[in-house]
Amino acid sequence: GKYLVFPWEEILLPHSAFRHKKKRSLLNKPKPKLLSAISTGSWDAMMWGPYYEDRAEYYSCWIDFCLKHNPEMEFYLSDAWPSLRQLNPPPKSEDDLNLNVFVKLDKEKDKNLKDLVEELEQKYPNKVHIIPTSDAMVLAVQAYYQGKLPEVKSINRWLSGETYSIWRDKLGHLGPGFERLEGYVFYATVYKRSPVHIEGEIPFKSIIDKKLGKLNDPSKEMDLLFRHIAWKAVINNPMSGVLDKNKDGIGD
């Protein structure tokens, strides 16, 4: 399939190509090449990341334009994942964290996204779906506390100083290897298939950190766990639009 994935400056304000007024310093003038690509190409889906104070109209302007030129397109919004910046006061150490903290943060994010998606669903039935990366990351936190991620040494490098952490900073950028989990969640949602069914070796690039150099890749065991977590997150989130009633790893 052919997919339109927004770069971060477009994610910050999804309707930026339709508005000439700058609202953030990161935004340049509208990029007509994106509208041209949509209007002249054949596309299957558009994907976004969320941002603060999102509104349905920020997305509907894109959806309307896309459906005008590609009526069969579907639309996907990643729900990102919990961030320590949501906590007030911020944690002083990982002793202040536990699974329940992340479950609570995830539910707070879900509530906001649910309202947004339901509003869009009323206008575009069965067209808008959530990519539940947040749910998957909470499941990863659960696996960590259960001792199922022995290669991972902490929850957040910002608190622990450990290189191999689930997150690497207060904002919530992923730790080494967890981009695979994010990718598997995207795959599972869009293709409605469990990543466990992916055959053969995936030629992942090695992780090179600007300060730390080449980092260890996730083991095959950790990679397989990521695939299972991704599918579990997707089929258990009703906003993903993916069901697996017979549990064969193929969306119904």
What do these predicted ranges mean?
Residues 1-65:
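Conserved SGNH/GDSL esterase-like catalytic core that processes O-acyl groups on lipids
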Residues 2-5, 50-56, 80-85, 135-139, ...:
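Solvent-exposed loop/turn segments at secondary-structure junctions
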Residues 28-32, 55-62, 99-117:
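Well-ordered, non-membrane alpha-helical segments in soluble/globular domains
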Residues 44-49, 74-79, 129-132:
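Structural recognition of the beta-strand scaffold that forms the well-ordered cores
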Residues 65-76:
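A short helix->loop->beta-strand "cap" motif at the edges of active sites that frequently abuts
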Residues 83-110, 114, 139:
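Serine-dependent acyl-ester chemistry module
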Residues 111-164, 183-194:
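Extracellular serine-dependent O-acyl
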Residues 154-252:
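Conserved catalytic region of serine esterases and O-acyltransferases that act on ester linkages
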